[in-house]
Amino acid sequence: MFEIIVDSAANIPAELCKKYKIKVLSFVNLVNGKEMTCFEPDLTPEQERAKGKEYYDAIREGAEVKTGLISSGIFEDTFREIIEADKDILYFSLSKNISGNYNSARVAADAVLDDCSNGRKIRLVDSLNASLGQGLLAIYASEMREKGMSFDEVADTIETYPARLNGVFTVGNLKYIARTGRLSGTTALVGNMLSIKPILRGSKDGYIVQFRKCRGRKAVLNELVNLLCDNITDPENQIIGVAHADAYEDSLYVIEQIKKRIKVRDVINTTYDFCTGSHVGPESLAVFFMGKDRELGGGGRGAPPLSFFFFFLF
């Protein structure tokens, strides 16, 4: 027996967490000084979308949002309870190169295993990603568990997936990246005036990398579709993910265009998680899929790659 755990940045809708028996540890944000739990286990998809609209509207209106790590104490209490119940643990983290959450979990896991002598295991998987790039790994692991694979078989197999699970996204307004200090306010202002839309992706090392640029919202959405369709492998056996920061109509458009070109097993369409979403801002939209690697080709349609940058979320 083993438990699959994610943090709420994995962006798995509540109903799917129940279906796949995935435990979620929630981030807690401060919004204008008031605590907000990022994941609520009993929300319907409609309620999740409504909560997302409320949250991203608050950001549009200038709310002060502060994010933080899940403490090693919370990890330790959670891990200890499961290990003492004689179960192994498989935990999927945000990329450790954009968050310190992996290290918090590592400290907790070491402390629990030092105290426990029942032979149970804790394995941590660095997703090298965020949002559904993290969540899809947990879902695939759950499917393997359901098929009867052992803990080590699942962990050994799923550890090969992050190198092929691509995350590609765009932002709605450059000012939110400027607020992180990784883009000047002047550059953001000019970029917005010219309707320059960047495309970013997760690198093979789990950093956020600026990849391409487009002119206009529809063009950048089409380019996300191109990149997915040109690089996905075995789509008929894949679940693809679409996450949006209160850009529901755009997410439906992207899914419609993808389905016109390829057949996929399933699509998860969800509101972008509130922790990482606060750093990229409203109208951000991401797609997630398995490719042969994370060195994306295709797409482009003449748009040259840009130099890379990376930033820590927390």
PLM region descriptions:
Residues 3-74:
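N-terminal glycine-rich anion-binding loop in soluble enzyme alpha/beta folds
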Residues 3, 9-17, 22-23, 28-36, ...:
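Mixed-charge interfacial surface used for oligomerization/domain docking
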Residues 1, 85-88, 263:
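Short loop/turn motifs at secondary-structure junctions
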Residues 60-96, 103-107, 155, 162:
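Glycine-rich phosphate- or other oxyanion-binding loops that anchor nucleotides, phosphorylated ligands
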Residues 306-314:
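Hydrophobic alpha-helical signal peptides and transmembrane signal-/tail-anchor segments
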Residues 297-302, 311:
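Intrinsically disordered, glycine-rich low-complexity segments
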Residues 93-95, 125-128:
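Short beta-strand->loop
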